[in-house]
Amino acid sequence: MSAKFEISFSKSVKLNGGLAILLKTAEADSAAGAETADPAGVIAKAAKIARFSAKSMATLDIVAPEGAPVERIVVVGIGKVGELTAHDWLKAGGAAASKVKNTDKVAIFIDVPGLETDARAAADFALGMLLRAYSFDAYKTKKNDDEEKSAKSVKVTIVTADATGARKAFSESEAIAGGVNLARDLVNEPPNALGPVEFAARAKELENLGVEVEILTEKEMRRLGMGALLGVAQGSVRPPRLAVMQWKGGKAKDRPVAFVGKGVVFDTGGISIKPAAGMEDMKGDMGGAAAVTGLMHVLAARKAAVNAVGIIGLVENMPDGNAQRPGDIVTSMSGQTIEVINTDAEGRLVLCDALWYCSDRFKPQFMINLATLTGAIVVALGNVHAGLFSNDDQLSAQLTAAGLSTNEKLWRMPLGKDYDKLIDSKFADMKNTGGRQAGSITAAHFLKRFVQDTPWAHLDIAGTAMGSPQDEINQSWGSGFGVRLLDELVRANCESR
C-alpha cells in the first residue's frame, strides 16, 4: 500500500507542530522557509556540525528545539542552481517523501532564496513524492511499524508563491502518478493472481476514465488468424486475451498514435524451459503491457488532446502436453509463416500479431511497442538505458528527447539487412530467433517485418521494467518504466491543442 499524501498548495502556512521540510541550494546562505520554521536558527548550527553542504539530494534531519513551531525540521539539498534540472525536482520530492515519518502533517517550503520556482517545478516536486510513496504490500498479513504508519493519511502543504498555478499543474502530476503506479501494481502482482483474463479485466477498468476497451477472446483471435500469438498460449490452461484500449481526446479526423505491449503474464520458456533460478521474476514479463496500460490511464486522466490506441497481447507461456514445440511452423495474422526455433523467444510471436492487427485496423500515425524482449539488451545496456530500435529517424529523435526529459533513458541500436537475413528460415518465411549473436537486434528485425510502412519504434525494456536499482522516486521492484517517457512524447509532439 502506498503512503497516502493529501497534497495541497498555499502561499503561506501557519505552523503548529508536525514536520517542516525546507529546500536549500548549495549557494544560498539559508533554506527556503527558514525564517518561518526555524526562528531560533538551529539549521545553521546543525549544518555546520554535520558539514551539510546541500549537495543534490543530501538531507539533514533535525529535532526542533523547545518553543519551535514544529517538532522536526528536514533540510533537503538540491545542489547548485545552474545544474538543477526538471528531473531534480522529482528527486527532491522523493527525498522529502522518504523523511515523512511519525507525523500526520507536513509543511514543505520550496521557494529557495535566489531560485525562481515555477508552478511546474512545484508540481514535479509533488509528483516525486507520490512516486516515492508507492509500495506493494497487498499480500502481507503482518506489517512492520513503518508499513502500518504508511497506511495513514498525511496532510502535505507545499508552500510556494504560485500556489494557484502549482495546483493546476498538479492535476496532471496526479494523472502521471496514477498511471506509473498502476503499471507498477501490474508488474508486482503474483502470476497466480494476474493471468491474461485478470489483466484484461484491469484494462477494462479504464472505462471509468473514458477509455473505450474491447477484449478479444481466443475464438475471435483465431478468426483473425493470429496463429503466432495463439501458438504461445496453447500450452497454458489460462486462455489468452487481446485488450484494445482507445482514448479519443483529439479531433475526429486525426489518425491515432498507437502503443503495443507484450503481456506474457508468466514465462517459463515453454518447452525450451528456463533455468529454475530467477524464474519467479518472469511474472514481470508483461512489463510492456503494464506500461501501455499505465500510459492509457495517464492520457485519459489528464484528458490529453490526442487520439491514442493501446493494444496488449496477454498470454501465459507454459510447457504442458499441448505446448508449442521447437520446429513448429505457425502462420501469423499477416499470412507470413514462422518457424519456431526456441519457444522462449515467445514475446515477438505475441507482438507480431498485435502489431499487424494495430497497423491494419487503425492506420496509426506511428506505432511504438514495448517489451521485456531479450536478455541480450540487458547485457548490452544494463538497467540504465532501454534499447531503442526504429525505422523512422524523426520518431527516434522524439523518443530520445522524451527519454532525456523524463530520465527514462533510451539508446538507439542499429538495424540493417545483414542482421535481418539472420532470421531467414529454410522451412518458413522466417524463424523466431537468429541465434546467439546480436539477439536484441534480430528480435527487433523480426518485429519490423510486421509493421508494414508505419513509422515504428521498438523499446526493449528488459533491463529497466523490473528489478532496476532503487532511487529517489522508485523503491519498487516493478518500476513503471515507459509511462512517463511516452506521456512526455505525446505531450511534446502529438497533442492538438
Swiss-Prot record:
Signal peptide: none annotated. Transmembrane segments: none annotated. Its cofactor is Mn(2+). It comes from the Bacteria. Disulfide bonds: none annotated. One of its GO terms (cellular component) is cytoplasm. InterPro entries: Leucine_aapep/pepB, Macro_dom-like, Peptidase_M17_C, Peptidase_M17_leu_NH2_pept, Peptidase_M17_N. Its EC number is 3.4.11.1, 3.4.11.10. Keywords: Aminopeptidase, Cytoplasm, Hydrolase, Manganese, Metal-binding, Protease. Mn(2+) 1 binds at D267, D344, E346. PANTHER family: CYTOSOL AMINOPEPTIDASE, LEUCINE AMINOPEPTIDASE-RELATED. This is Probable cytosol aminopeptidase. It comes from Rhizobium etli (strain ATCC 51251 / DSM 11541 / JCM 21823 / NBRC 15573 / CFN 42).
